[in-house]
Amino acid sequence: MLIKFQGKTPQVGDKVFIAQGAKVIGEVELGEDSSVWFNCVLRADFNFIKIGKRTNIQDLTTIHIWHREPNDKGYPTIIGDDVSIGHNCVIHACEIKNRVLVGMNSTIMDGACIEEDSIVGAGSVVTKHKKFPPRSLILGNPAKVIRELSQEEVDFLKISAQNYVEFKNAFLKESSVTQKPIF
């Protein structure tokens, strides 16, 4: 469901799938071929969320921002192309670059940045303002770099995202859900 908030309507690219029960609120931009799965909440009420092409946000994930205030520009949430966000994650006011896999039940906090071609392992907690280099395997609570990813692991990241493009295409073929904004 697309929900307009304070004059901002979510912007949805071509061939995007938003599953039943998902809520996309306010200043959200969803790139072409992306998918937002069942019971996700993307709430861009007082800052923006931008999601790139071929990115999948899996079931029960929450994506939010840090509010803009008079003396604080806050943090938007920016997610790149070919990103897979696993089930039941919390992605809060951070940046995730291209070709990243965030494992199930992970949390990424305000001001953190995951550089391209990286994996955040299931259940990891990336704390505020933490920055990780490209090609990192990131695990733990608090999360830390365990090692650099192999080329085979990096290649898998794009395959994972492409699998979800195919899954969402199958759902789009059979789905009777309307994607019209709610005013």
Which stretches of residues belong to each language-model region?
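Structural signal for interior beta-strand "rungs" in well-ordered beta-sheet cores
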Residues: K4-P133, L137-I138, A143-V145
